[in-house]
Amino acid sequence: MAGAKEIRSKIASIKSTQKITSAMEKVAVSKMRKAQMRMAASRPYAERIRQVIGHLANANPEYLHPFMIERPLKRVGYVVVSSDRGLCGGLNTNLFKTLVKDMAVNRENGVEIDLCVVGSKGAAFFRNFGGNVVAAISHLGEEPSINDLIGSVKVMLDAYLDGRIDRLSVVSNKFINTMTQQPTVEQLIPLVATPDQGLKHHWDYLYEPDAKELLDGLMVRYVESQVYQAVVENNAAEQAARMIAMKNATDNAGDLISDLQLIYNKARQAAITQEISEIVGGAAAV
C-alpha cells in the first residue's frame, strides 16, 4: 500500500491548496466590489471636466490649447497601466500583447516611443522586452490616489508641452463585466473631438480669472483624472480576473481530488483482493 499512502498524501496536499485558492477567490470578490465602487465614483468627475473644457473652448475660440493641436508624429508616449501582483490569469499578458502590436505599427512608420509604466508587472515586462521607460510607479495599493500619479503623469505632460512627444495614450484594461476585461489603447492628447452631451445647451459664463487660465489648469487635471480612471478600472479588472482564476483553480483542485480518490479506491481494492487471494491460496495448500 505504499502507492496508496502517496496518493493519500497528495490528496491532503491538494485539499490544502484548494482552501487557499477558495479563500483568495472570496477576497478577490470583496476587493472587486470595492474597486467597482471607486470606478463608478471617479467616472463622472472626468466626464464633467470634459464638458467644462468644451464650454471653455467655445467661450474662447481664438485660443487653441497645445493639448488640442494635432502634430506630425515623430515620437509618441504611452502610460501603461499594469498590476502589481500576478495570479490574475492572462490580464497583463493580453495587455502587453495589445501594446506591443500598437508600438510595432508606430515603429514601422519611423515613430519613436517613450513609456510611463504603472505597476510592477509592467516594469518587469519592459526590463526584459526593452523600451525607453522615462517614468515608473508601482505599489499604489488597493486604494490609489490621484496624487500618487501626478508626478509620473507630469513627466509625460512636460514632454508633450516641450515637443519631445507628439501624442500621449493610456494603455489599460477596461472592466466590461466580471467575465470580460478588454485591453485598450486610448489617446489622451491631443484631445480627440467627440460629440459632447454637455453642449446641447449653451450658456454664457463669467470666468474668473479668465477662460484661458482655467482651460490651462483643467486640461492638465483632465489628463490626470483619465489616467487615474484607467488605474482604478484596471484594478477592478485585475480583481475580477483573479476571482475567475482562483475559482478555476479551486474547481480544478476538486476534479483532481476526485480523480485521485478514485485511483486510491482502486488501489485499495486491488490490495484487498490480493490479500484475500493469498489467504485463500494458503488455506487451500493446507
UniProtKB/Swiss-Prot annotation:
InterPro entries documented for this protein: ATP_synth_F1_ATPase_gsu, ATP_synth_F1_gsu, ATP_synth_F1_gsu_CS
CDD domains from the entry?
Answer: F1-ATPase_gamma
Pfam short name (any one):
ATP-synt
| Entry keywords, A to Z | ATP synthesis, Cell inner membrane, Cell membrane, CF(1), Hydrogen ion transport, Ion transport, Membrane, Transport
Give GO MF terms, alphabetically.
ATP binding; proton-transporting ATP synthase activity, rotational mechanism
Q: Where does the protein end up?
A: Cell inner membrane
Q: Name one GO biological process term.
A: proton motive force-driven plasma membrane ATP synthesis
GO cellular component terms given for this protein = plasma membrane; proton-transporting ATP synthase complex
Its membrane topology, per UniProt?
Peripheral membrane protein
The function of this protein is: Produces ATP from ADP in the presence of a proton gradient across the membrane. The gamma chain is believed to be important in regulating ATPase activity and the flow of protons through the CF(0) complex.
**Cited HAMAP family:** ATP_synth_gamma_bact (MF_00815)
Q: Which NCBIfam families match?
A: ATPsyn_F1gamma (TIGR01146), PRK05621.1-1 (NF004144)
Q: How does it assemble?
A: F-type ATPases have 2 components, CF(1) - the catalytic core - and CF(0) - the membrane proton channel. CF(1) has five subunits: alpha(3), beta(3), gamma(1), delta(1), epsilon(1). CF(0) has three main subunits: a, b and c.
Entry similarity comment: Belongs to the ATPase gamma chain family.
Name of the protein: ATP synthase gamma chain
Q: Which species does the entry assign this protein to? A: Pseudomonas syringae pv. tomato (strain ATCC BAA-871 / DC3000)
